[in-house]
Amino acid sequence: MLKIGIVGCGFIGGQICRAIDGGEVSAELYALCDSSESKALELAASLKTCKPSYMKIEELIRGVDLIIESASQNAVRFIVPQALKAGCDVMILSVGALADEELRDTLFGLAKEHNCKLYFPSGAVVGIDGLNSASAAGISSVTLSTRKPPAGLMGAPYVVEHGIELEKLEKKTVLFEGPASEAVKAFPANVNVAATISLAGIGFERTRVKVIADPSLFRNVHEIIVEGEFGKFSTRVENLPSPENPKTSYLAALSAVSTLKKILNPVQIGT
């Protein structure tokens, strides 16, 4: 049975734990790791059948087959290279870290060198399968428009640096428009989907992103438009925010669980 270690015990990490604990996913939940030991222990204590240990990252890496990162972009930079060198497969949720070309090349190189797999869930959007297919023929443009309630954008580096008072917004306001390479740094906890789209499509510099704060919204809305030699397609998702973290869409957690199921399933459906 696949032994899994989860790094990051927030909403997404918790949902994955509960999916394994409830028998929805047939795997061994071996260990948890979080910058807050108490948070990891609290999550472990809430489970009914699984009894994962709390471990420091070095110990966790030595004991598992698959690490699921659901912590932060900094965690990706620090943990994933170590895991790959140790022969662990890794699922990355904080995909925005890979906007760093040097890090991206390092991780892809290590995965190849050590015969490991890197998994990137679709996250809070749909259409990644179509984007993968379209890239085989050639894509001319990819645009992502993300609209969120102001509360879901609080604390983002871009918001803080520009002194934007989100709580005072009375109408829909465009906060950012530019390449995905800049968007994932400006809003690291909000637009990981931009990174996933970039990896599947035409890269971080050519993928265009617009981030909008909309006080009339109660959901996170992601719209993607893709054009190329295949034709054109568009997708729209209205996600309910996580009840624990308004910056995270519930669908992102479900996507991680689905990716884990796909890893374990001998039958693969879709691109």
Curated annotation (Swiss-Prot):
GO annotation, biological process: NAD biosynthetic process
Pfam families: Asp_DH_C, NAD_binding_3
Gene Ontology molecular function, alphabetical: aspartate dehydrogenase activity; NAD binding; NADP binding; oxidoreductase activity, acting on the CH-NH2 group of donors, NAD or NADP as acceptor
Record-linked InterPro entries: Asp/hSer_DH_NAD-bd, Asp_DH, Asp_DH_arc, Asp_DH_prok, L-Asp_DH, NAD(P)-bd_dom_sf
Keyword ATP-binding: no
Protein's pathway: Cofactor biosynthesis; NAD(+) biosynthesis; iminoaspartate from L-aspartate (dehydrogenase route): step 1/1
Disulfide links within the chain: none
Recorded catalytic activity of this chain's protein: L-aspartate + NADP(+) + H2O = oxaloacetate + NH4(+) + NADPH + H(+); L-aspartate + NAD(+) + H2O = oxaloacetate + NH4(+) + NADH + H(+)
Transmembrane regions: none
EC number of this enzyme: 1.4.1.21
Enzyme class: oxidoreductase
Catalytic residues as annotated in Swiss-Prot or TrEMBL: H222
Alphabetized PANTHER family for the sequence: ASPARTATE DEHYDROGENASE DOMAIN-CONTAINING PROTEIN (PTHR31873:SF6), L-ASPARTATE DEHYDROGENASE-RELATED (PTHR31873)
Job description of the protein: Specifically catalyzes the NAD or NADP-dependent dehydrogenation of L-aspartate to iminoaspartate.
Family, as annotated: Belongs to the L-aspartate dehydrogenase family.
Note: The iminoaspartate product is unstable in aqueous solution and can decompose to oxaloacetate and ammonia.
Protein name: L-aspartate dehydrogenase
